[in-house]
Amino acid sequence: MTSFVKVPAFFISNQGRAEPCSSADVFRSKRVSAEQWSSTSISSGRQVLADLLKLAFAVIGLLSPVTACGSEPTSAASSQASVKSRPNIVIILADDLGYSDLGCYGSEVATPHLDSLAANGVRFTQFYNTARCWPTRAALLTGYYPQQIHRDALPKLPGGSQGTRQPWAKLLPELLKSAGYHSYHSGKWHVDGPVLASGFEKSLNVRNDGNFFTAAGNLIDDQPVTPAQDESGYYSTIDTIDHAIECLNHHTRSHSDAPFFQYVPFIAPHFPLHALPEDIARYRDRYLEGWDTLRQQRFQRQRDLGLVQTTLSPLEREVGPPYAFPEALKKLGPGEINRPLPWTELTAEQQQFQATKMAIHAAMVDRMDREIGRYLQALRSAEVFDKTLILFASDNGASAEIMVRAGGHDPAAPPGSAKSYLCLGPGFSSAANTPFRRHKTWVHEGGISTPLIAHWPGGITSQGALRHTPTHMIDLVPTILELADVTPPAEFEGQPVPARPGKSIVKAFNEDVGIDRDSLWWLHEGNRAVRVGNWKLVAAKDTPWELYDLTNDRAEQQNLAAELPDRVRELEQVWQKQTDSFEQLAALTQPVRTPGGKKAGKK
């Protein structure tokens, strides 16, 4: 029987120590450049990846209970030498990217630049998000669960879904200022408050996520953009990296002796499925074999790469989109379906329509990787690549949503063009989330599991290694603060600042170690879960708890709730105590709805 530790009160410091877990035979692959990857075809690139990353499994045991541990305080007045020694930090975030959508996580999609980062860095196999875009961004940039800071709802505080953070819940750029960092934002925001007021010095706020082919609605440094009269060459994924490179060049010219933090959150591959015609052409008809076959193919690659120790979850044929939009189905025509039916039962028209949507999704991921490659080259040209920590992740799992909004959908328009409005849907979303169950908004593994790639030549000596310890978006702020040698303020206006629940994962960069923590906790729109060690209690909205032993069942197939009712009660108490603690903290301040929050809700 696993022993569970008491969930700490929200004002208790709970900085955890990382202890070695079970030994792992970590294969160190040779360094591989993006240029080498680019010279291969999609199919041969996958074989090269499998050959390079012959990685063994690490057998992860139950996490150890938390032990009280605090870091040594550091002075805000750092020496110039100390400032120079701190790494630059780059966080790249995809939007609605599935766990298996990158080549280095099992995909057939060509992602040579991210694959190269993985081959020369480390990949985390059990990294989690919050299941939705805006709660994940709050967790990533503050180090708190979003429910603690009015950025997602609680049972007794439903008004906190997209409220204004408490003033003590500072974002990462504000915390890094004391260490001499300059911070820049390029891409989606979806956080409360103006960007520049949050510590960023320059910003491109890509707000018009209803059309990838126009800059209308975007903000530069919190001011509206005037779109060019001719936007025929505009595509938001390219524009995001154009701005990121401009910020990097500005920093190199103006602050070359200081470290920088760049936050690059793409909109891609979020719906609407919009991609450049030449990118779509690379994947045209690639997916006519269907989602059932694609899941099997990706799962086999994941097994070959040592990423998973689970079975492949069967498709849940009756689980469709999380929200019903019957009018959208009428507008989209007979090719659209809202269930992941057996591929052989679809009509030829439906198969072509669905395969085309997946081709556009793949094209969006492909283009994102190409633009990341352009940014990586800019880092090399600025001679800062080796001293820059790059973290790549996704805000939630792939989306099963089907809807039509913004400018609507023209059935006569080429799929993927500005006048089309397509969503991936539950069939190929299930393939993108291979090998897990469910999708974005759910807190089963498919909704909350994301790749995490960490690359830092100056600090990560492992090459191509896997990290098996469960980690979460809330861990990134403590990790970065440790590397920057920053101790966050203990007080705000004379009151104690609540301890961040996340843990630094710095030690895991070079060792496959466990991270001490009580639990990991989830709640979104009634979907709820808690993980303690390898035990996970999870339930969809208005359904009973399910219990899984994730040691060999991350596919969440063997529900043990009926067999182990005591375990269910024990884990439910952990979940409830954490929930009560968050409600007590959040209730101290009144959540204020942010402007535009209602519109932003369904993302």
Positions of PLM-derived features:
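Aromatic (phenylalanine/tyrosine) cluster motif
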Residues: 4, 10-11, 27, 57
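Basic polycationic patches enriched in arginine
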Residues: 17, 28-31, 46
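Bacterial N-terminal signal peptides
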Residues: 52-66
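Formylglycine-dependent sulfatase
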Residues: 61-63, 69-541, 545, 552-573, ...
